[in-house]
């Protein structure tokens, strides 16, 4: 076995035959964009619905996260247990997440069951009811997670860095506190949902072994006509950071067994 000479850098070579598969763009009847990336031989489909709303758009923390999270907790035609049982029966997996600018609904499904699983997903996205009982459970679970995470040094450092960069008046500088969870209720979530979850503010991305039947199912459930309150005006607010002058900040935590260092500055804006 040849011993590597780590004092000599490896040779630099030009990449050959490098290409990235580009998605095809379809414009559905209601104007929603559908991006299709057909690749792979396995009968698996990944479906992503992207909602142009996130932390920057919420009127109070953590409104955006809970609106997204509660989509799976009951609709006008399906209870939370029915949604979970049906997705499990078809071997599908669901992921709900929210970021600074966007909300994401991701479904992984076998292609042969996609007509069934997309029907469940359409009900979740187009007719959620945000039931108070399920919301209370979700809030309690997240409050416990908040209390645990609040003691982690890496979380403390990240929050303090963002507060120094953006300021408390900026959405990226203010994080949810424990009392913010008690202000979350169904009406707060419904307000955010009706404002942003509609066909005029969403786009669809589908990848995997995408057949014409898969595209037809997506168009049938999401592209035939407008859904949601498309008359709502999307607010495009601009927030100005108020950066602290201090370049080095030290936060002491008693009895901490670890330390965390965060370094950050402003870079290129989102394009």
Residue ranges and their predicted role:
Residues 1-8, 27, 82-233:
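Charge-rich, well-structured scaffold segments of protease-associated domains
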Residues 1-85, 190-271:
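His/Glu-rich zincin catalytic helix
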């Amino acid at each position: 076995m040849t011993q590597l000479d780590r004092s000599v850098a490896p040779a630099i070579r030009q990449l050959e035959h490098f290409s990235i598969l580009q998605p095809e763009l379809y414009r559905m009847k209601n104007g929603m964009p559908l991006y299709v990336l057909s690749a792979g031989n396995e009968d698996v489909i990944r479906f992503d619905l992207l909602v142009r709303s996130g932390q920057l758009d919420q009127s109070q923390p953590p409104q955006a996260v809970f609106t997204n999270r509660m989509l799976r907790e009951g609709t006008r035609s399906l209870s939370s247990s029915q949604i979970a049982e049906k997705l499990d029966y078809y071997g599908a997996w669901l992921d709900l997440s929210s970021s600074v600018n966007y909300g994401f609904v991701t479904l992984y499904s076998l292609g042969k069951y996609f007509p069934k699983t997309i029907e469940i997903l359409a009900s979740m996205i187009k007719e959620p009811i945000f039931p108070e009982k399920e919301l209370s459970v979700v809030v309690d679970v997240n409050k416990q997670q908040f209390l645990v995470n609040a003691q982690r040094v890496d979380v403390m450092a990240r929050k303090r860095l963002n507060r120094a960069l953006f300021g408390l008046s900026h959405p990226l500088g203010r994080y949810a506190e424990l009392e913010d969870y008690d202000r979350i209720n169904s009406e707060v979530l419904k307000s955010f949902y009706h404002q942003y979850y509609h066909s005029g503010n969403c786009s669809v991305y589908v990848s995997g072994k995408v057949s014409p039947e898969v595209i037809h199912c997506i168009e049938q459930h999401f592209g035939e006509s407008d859904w949601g309150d498309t008359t709502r005006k999307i607010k495009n607010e601009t927030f100005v950071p108020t950066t602290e002058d201090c370049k080095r900040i030290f936060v002491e935590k008693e009895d901490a067994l670890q330390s965390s260092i965060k370094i950050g500055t402003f870079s290129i804006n989102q394009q």
